[in-house]
């Protein structure tokens, strides 16, 4: 049993969301009173934000389970990115700059899509959700890393560690699913342009995005429960800058075979299914582009897929480097910096790629700037 009596008793007192309720209010106000695009977003936007805000409740349950499991460890020590004091300031400045660009880029992209009627299509709706996922994922890891940079002992409580594990796994699954959904959307747009409105109706878009969010939260919760159901009674030092599932398994002093099998099965299933959807979509897209007689049509189709292909290459390339390298060349320091790229850099690059390389996004931004300039006159 994953849940103990103690954790079940405490369920009724966990009413307030872990994150600030203003996020929910912002989301409701943000998407209210819009016509075309709001019909595509509102049915699930509030529910998604509320589920994300209440994600900490899941981690509180995990925390109560760990307490009832009589773990001797009440906190973990993170070694951080580096122990060199001279490099700490450099890392802090770089991480802070990246996080600010990530927040500005992704939130700005969401606002731009919201206020631009020409971007109120399923493709940009999915892009809006990818921007939200990237901002959420970066916010799960980066702020705590910045706070810990100059601390001598980079300790993190059991509850905060559970929150990070739950949040990071949720983010990883969301990213995989959003990239898969966007690949299918591009397949329909390029291979069946005349049937796009029929094959990508509003109801289907809502179902795909909502199911992605719900599935991601469930996977994050289940994996975190399995992790903190184990007993931690020995070493508590994690050679990482955030609470990661794999190093935590190595610290457990109870049987980890079930957790390891669960991690391998769920992660393998998610990556395999996502990769299959992406590969099949782009195989059909490639055949469709080859059959096009117009050079302009080919260029337009390629530009539609270029940004998404770059995001997929970065994401799966980093995963391959982190988990599929030979043991002989395996290094914890390499894993650490690959994790920086995976959790911090990619969310920033996605917002830049989809804004700077997308002609429609740039045109929408130019129109808004021109409108603001004319209003000042």
Predicted regions mapped to residue ranges:
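Transmembrane helical core of 7TM receptor-like proteins
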Residues: 1-377
């Amino acid at each position: 049993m994953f849940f103990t009596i103690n954790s079940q008793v405490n369920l009724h007192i966990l009413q307030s969301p872990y994150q600030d309720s203003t996020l929910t209010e912002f989301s409701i106000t943000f998407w209210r009173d819009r016509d075309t695009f709001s019909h595509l977003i509102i049915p699930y936007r509030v529910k998604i934000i509320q589920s994300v805000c209440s994600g900490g409740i899941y981690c509180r349950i995990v925390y109560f389970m760990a307490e009832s499991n009589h773990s001797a460890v009440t906190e973990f020590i993170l070694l951080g990115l580096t122990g060199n004091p001279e490099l700490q300031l450099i890392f802090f400045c770089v991480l802070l700059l990246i996080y600010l660009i990530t927040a500005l880029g992704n939130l700005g992209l969401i606002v731009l899509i919201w206020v631009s009627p020409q971007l109120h299509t399923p493709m940009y709706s999915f892009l809006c959700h990818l921007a939200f996922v990237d901002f959420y994922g970066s916010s799960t890891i980066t702020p705590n890393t910045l706070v810990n940079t100059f601390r001598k002992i980079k300790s993190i409580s059991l509850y905060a560690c559970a929150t990070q594990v739950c949040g990071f796994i949720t983010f990883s699954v969301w990213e995989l699913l959003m990239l898969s959904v966007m690949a299918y959307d591009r397949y329909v747009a390029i291979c069946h342009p005349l049937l796009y409105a029929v094959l990508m109706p509003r109801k289907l878009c809502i179902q795909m995005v909502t199911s992605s969010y719900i599935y991601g939260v469930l996977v994050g919760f289940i994996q975190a429960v399995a992790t903190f159901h184990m007993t931690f009674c020995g070493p508590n030092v994690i050679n990482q800058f955030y609470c990661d599932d794999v190093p935590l398994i190595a610290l457990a002093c109870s049987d980890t075979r079930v957790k390891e099998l669960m991690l391998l099965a769920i992660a393998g299933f998610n990556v395999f299914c996502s990769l299959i959807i992406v590969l099949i979509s782009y195989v059909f897209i490639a055949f469709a582009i080859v059959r096009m007689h117009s050079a302009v049509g080919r260029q337009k189709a390629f530009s539609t897929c270029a940004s998404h292909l770059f995001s997929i290459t970065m994401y799966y390339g980093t995963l391959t480097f982190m988990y599929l390298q030979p043991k002989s060349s395996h290094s914890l320091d390499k894993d650490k910096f690959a994790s920086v790229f995976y959790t911090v850099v990619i969310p920033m690059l996605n917002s830049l790629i989809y804004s700077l390389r997308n002609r429609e996004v740039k045109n929408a931004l130019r129109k808004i700037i021109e409108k603001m300039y004319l209003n000042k006159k």
